[in-house]
Amino acid sequence: MNRRIRQSKSLNLPTYPGEYIYIPDMLVAIVALANYSSQYDGKYSTTVNMWVERAKKEWIDKETGLVASFLEVYNDSIRIVLPVKGSYSALNCYYLSLVDPEFAKEQYDCLMKNYKQGFPFAGIKEYHDRTCLFGMDIDAGPIIFNLSPSGTAFAIGCATSLDDMEFRNKLLKTAELGGSTVTWFGKSHYLLANLALVGEAIVLAMRTSAPKTRM
């Protein structure tokens, strides 16, 4: 994986052949390389640092200040593809918190500025530039009162990693409203998970995120 990334002029690989580069997917690779490097004498740390620096300099959306959701390779150059989505931005921020906490905090501040919603429910909007009270998004799922279910879940991980406990608690209240915790024989899970199991797994991962474990 490191070899293929370094062989790419953009330091990015497409998730699917012939499609855009999905930045959250690339960040999975970068986090994996960073984790490996932390245990094996920084073996791939140069690649990780190069990628993060390119992201800071070349892949920032001017309007929101956030790392792009999508990139497109065009001839020998690479360009940002709009829109910058709340779900992708929250996931980008979470992964960055595991690689470069300082940059992640900058991204988190931009996420809060452009996508944070406090009323009627705390969460992350999928779109920063338009209202969507009810709709369906191919990435985020059902949009309700502007909120992105995926973005809101991923933001729990951002808030946990970056120690924003005030907003984290508000997000967990929203998750409870949407998921409805039930307890049976000493075990708890979201009732909604009977229909959306992946959502429960994501929330569990996000609320127990590094650097500290909190339930």
Residue ranges, per PLM feature:
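Intrinsically disordered, low-complexity linker/loop segments enriched in Gly/Pro
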Residues: 1-9
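Residue-level recognition of well-ordered secondary-structure positions
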Residues: 2, 30-31, 93, 156, ...
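Extended ligand-binding clefts on enzyme/binding-domain cores
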Residues: 8-11, 19-150
